[in-house]
Amino acid sequence: MDMAHERDASSEEEVMGGDLRRGPWTVEEDLLLVNYIAAHGEGRWNSLARSAGLKRTGKSCRLRWLNYLRPDLRRGNITPQEQLLILELHSRWGNRWSKIAQHLPGRTDNEIKNYWRTRVQKHAKQLKCDVNSQQFKDVMRYLWMPRLVERIQAAAAGQQQQQEGGTDTPPLSWQHGGSDGLYESPELPAPDASCWPAEYCAAAGGAQSGGTPAPELSSTTAGSSSLSTDSGAGAQPSWPTQADGAEWFTTACDASSATGGVAMRDTELELAQPPCQGGQTWTTSESSLPGLTFPDLAVADFEIGGFDVDSFWTSMEDDQLWCPTQAAV
């Protein structure tokens, strides 16, 4: 019955195809669609278009509602938390934009895809690497994502300092969480907490207060921040905490400019990576390890085609979505 109804609706749409409106939506059309859905809810989009008095296809109505008009859409730039989650989930699921969007409330799959193409692929091109190459994946894993974490923590510390009217905050670092190789989770910054589902925020808060721990990351892939579940339930990267002592990261990418930190314990594992488009191969040596505190990992020497990655970071200071060093405090 339902299938027959849809076929009839589709046939009717084809018949009246010459009367259908094309091009940008008008304010009046938006109001018709919003008011109809508010009164009757979402339904079969072909029938909805006719019932609402819209000379649009059902597909056009659906896309207009999902991507522009629904009330739970988030507006504005992708936040650092959202960036981190996109990078994390993409490393696990690839270009499955709809699946990734399910874990970023208020963001559309098209919006996430545009972020990936205009930001991530752009920086891979500037580094003369393919976005799917192991070299660029390591740049994201060891540079981009940790700096996003620093930026998130700095924003949280700045907000806490303002609330307390307080004192200077200590340097941020990654603190090993115990024998399980995971990291404990700090509280999410309040201004951006809305980008996470409620269960994520509850999990993050529980890790701080000694309650229910945050979702764990899989340790099956060296250096990756893979989530421990493929289900549609909550998915969240494991967050680092502040620690006294070694600073987590410096602005330089080689040992000569690294000013602190704890070297990774596993120096026997070497990354023998295929060449980048620039023709250079990365090598791993104990002397070239930056001051990272990832457990049981080795890291490549970030000299991609002779490109100075530190200068690259500095040159991107105007790019708020890439350069996490501009922490809002």
From Swiss-Prot:
HTH myb-type domain mapped to chain residues: 17-69, 70-124
GO BP terms: positive regulation of DNA-templated transcription; positive regulation of response to salt stress; positive regulation of response to water deprivation; regulation of DNA-templated transcription; response to cold
Tissues in which the protein is found: Highly expressed in leaves. Expressed in roots and shoots. Expressed at low levels in flowers.
Keywords attached to this entry: DNA-binding, Nucleus, Repeat, Stress response, Transcription, Transcription regulation
Recorded GO CC terms: nucleus
GO molecular function, one term: sequence-specific DNA binding
Region (Disordered): 155-189, 206-242
Domain of life: Eukaryota
Subcellular location field: Nucleus
Record field: compositional bias (Low complexity): 155-166, 217-235
Ranges of the DNA-binding region feature: 45-69, 97-120
Induction record: Induced by salt, cold and osmotic stresses, and abscisic acid (ABA). Down-regulated by salicylic acid (SA).
UniProt xrefs under Pfam families: Myb_DNA-binding (PF00249)
Keyword Repeat: yes
Known function: Transcription factor involved in abiotic stress responses. Plays a regulatory role in tolerance to salt, cold, and drought stresses. Positively regulates the expression of genes involved in proline synthesis and transport, and genes involved in reactive oxygen species (ROS) scavenging such as peroxidase, superoxide dismutase and catalase during salt stress. Transactivates stress-related genes, including LEA3, RAB16A and DREB2A during salt stress.
Misc remark: Plants over-expressing MYB2 show increased tolerance to salt, cold, and drought stresses, and increased sensitivity to abscisic acid (ABA).
Protein name (record): Transcription factor MYB2
Taxonomic lineage from the root: Eukaryota, Viridiplantae, Streptophyta, Embryophyta, Tracheophyta
